[in-house]
């Protein structure tokens, strides 16, 4: 459930420690947008990258207690924090639940952010994690911006444009832009968590974000 960013034009490689277990992850790419803009840039590095910082430098330097290095400069347009650990994210959601009202559409919805700006982690893609309390029955709304979800914890279902999609941990589903949707947690005793990545940085940057709440049927869709 860790979230790792590999921003545009950054060298990156994936691997598993010797003797480690097989690793499967979900990739989120902005290639369709970048290709449409004819701005794609792709290159292959011969060999492996040379390590220039200590292990876990980024999450240790930029992901601790709201503190950032006072003697470092960062001039990149993306977050200097490359790894957002689930072991920190889930407790943060639980703490946020103690002091925030439950949103009727999204429960507790927290955006992954650039610690230097408070904005999105990258210029073309955003990400968020939301907690649906036990027994949560979300109301329906729709908005511009496309969202791809992965269930990080629990089980439930989402109704998208009148069709029900059940999900459990590791399942992936998407909500297209301007589609009615509502999330439901099937457990009456355990919370559920949904991760998403989205194109909100682009939508918001172009001034195209808008949303609407469903008012019929007490805010819930009729399942087709």
Residue spans for each PLM region:
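Conserved metal-binding segment of the jelly-roll/cupin
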Residues: 1-18, 25, 160, 167-187, ...
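Short histidine-centered beta-strand/loop micro-motifs
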Residues: 15-16, 121-122, 137-143, 184-186
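Contiguous mid-protein beta-loop-alpha structural module that forms a pocket-lining wall or clamp
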Residues: 4, 8-62
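Short amphipathic alpha-helical linker/capping segments at the junctions of internal repeats
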Residues: 1-3, 33, 45-50, 164-173, ...
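A short, N-terminal "cap"/entry segment at the start of jelly-roll beta-barrel domains
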Residues: 44, 48-124, 128, 210, ...
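Active-site lining segments that contact anionic ligands and/or coordinate catalytic metals
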Residues: 107, 124-127, 145-146, 155, ...
